[in-house]
Amino acid sequence: AARTGRMSITDPPLQTLPRGRVVRDAIVARPGHCFVMADFAGMEMRVMASFSQDANMLAAYARGEDLHDFVAKEIYGIRFTKQERTVSKNAGFAKIYGAGIPKFAATAKIDVQTATAFMEQYDSLFPGVKTFMESVVAEVMERAGGDRRKYGYIELIDGRRLPVEADEAYKGVNYRIQGSCAIVTKEKIVEMDALGLGPYFRLAVHDELLYEVPLELAEDARRVIEAAM
């Protein structure tokens, strides 16, 4: 497992398969079975909304909006392009993973000046997120006694503590969100087991759970998953 408690799979690395169909099409269900997937639909951004309690972010989710569509619409206008949505999505994950402006610009394929301006607009749109991130850094530093050579810590949704190097206190945001997502995922695996899907569980890929069920049980499995998610 990763430091945050996020599950990690190696040999083969099924969570990081190459994009495209060549490799992925090699993974098939057994005869008489099919795959049924439970998807948490942008869990990390939802956890960010929960922790930050940002009013605009919570309102967008309450309306059932796709958050990245919402950001693109607010910043670029209602006729935003696919590329502009990608930039909006990259900005959200740059916040979660602590990426600086140069990294965000490179990932989003925009210049640094444009990336800087975009992040300023993003912070204006979601001021609660900026405040939350600053508070996490401050908490880590305070718990380290203000000494950058020491460790502070962050708390996950279940109260578990994760140590964070004070010199890299910004990582506390990612640890708190990713670690909390890992807890939610594992709790959901246990819940699905209690609902009878345990024997069919095959793989957890971060915010997705993959089940291999007999064809005659596929619809029942789908209903169970929909009710539980």
What residue spans do the PLM features occupy?
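Alpha-helical scaffold/interaction cores of sigma-54-like transcription cofactors
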Residues: 1-6, 97-101, 112
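Catalytic palm subdomain of template-directed nucleic-acid polymerases
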Residues: 48, 100-113, 209-226
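Residue-level preference for well-ordered alpha-helical positions
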Residues: 72-77, 94, 105, 109, ...
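Polymerase palm active-site segment centered on the conserved acidic dipeptide of motif C
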Residues: 120-138, 216-229
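Short, amphipathic alpha-helical "recognition" segments used to contact nucleic acids or chromatin
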Residues: 87-97
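Short, surface-exposed acidic
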Residues: 76-87, 111-118, 129-132
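Short Gly/aromatic-enriched secondary-structure transition segments
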Residues: 51, 117-120
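Acidic, glycine-rich two-metal-ion catalytic cores of nucleic acid-processing enzymes
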Residues: 1-79, 142-209, 221-229
